[in-house]
């Protein structure tokens, strides 16, 4: 289903009931069907045809939702758990697990489909359930080409601690500049999914209720600037102390369009809308027929970026891209793309 709050349209997904279970579908490679700790394990061997995550009905819903911007300026996705396994230690600071199939990083192929559909709306993903607060940038084909995901901490985390702790204790490529955290950057999770770790809140001491990394998360949508700020507060923090009271690495502000991190191949003409209106703009790659993204313009103008050479189609409308079509547009360098005046 969906809910719009203050001009932000949230898709609400059920990411449990339609997901395939591992028992009987893949060989058990750990103490229980969804935990893998076999050192010979190959992530590709468990990404089998026919496995599903959201299921076809919810995938269709996400596609339709991404193209319908009625009364919305920004979008977000809510679900129970994360589309990756951004955890190394489960239950204790030395209890390393190679892969956790309980997260939405498995099955991998439908995971990629879900993340790609979220990317089409330049939406962030908000969830919980992982017992460890993290902000990641999802990758599909390449690191960083997908949307941001914020997993909030457990409000009370007495049952099951988790830690982000790479085996080599090194940051990945492209670490976050000036981060107070040592292990940020590009990684693959235990399922082979590409993720960029932006921030994590490891428990300092599971026996100290003030140091076990429980707390709460806040996402602030700035419609004027088209940004989202992720905040992550320890349970016993005093918010009057300002941002310094948050977990190290937070707050984090991301631009709406950064939820699509594909490499830009060129730009279509900048669209200038009559009367300063902000219609919905959809960009389609002609060769594949793929919808690249559907978003609402800001400031009465919008310059579409595309990720391949060749012809593209732009559709425009007030709430959905259903009023005007501009066909046969080819990308150029931004400085040479020009402008088009459009009445929408």
Q: What are the roles of these predicted feature ranges?
A:
Residues 1-343:
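Long, structured stretches of catalytic cores involved in phosphate-ester chemistry, encompassing
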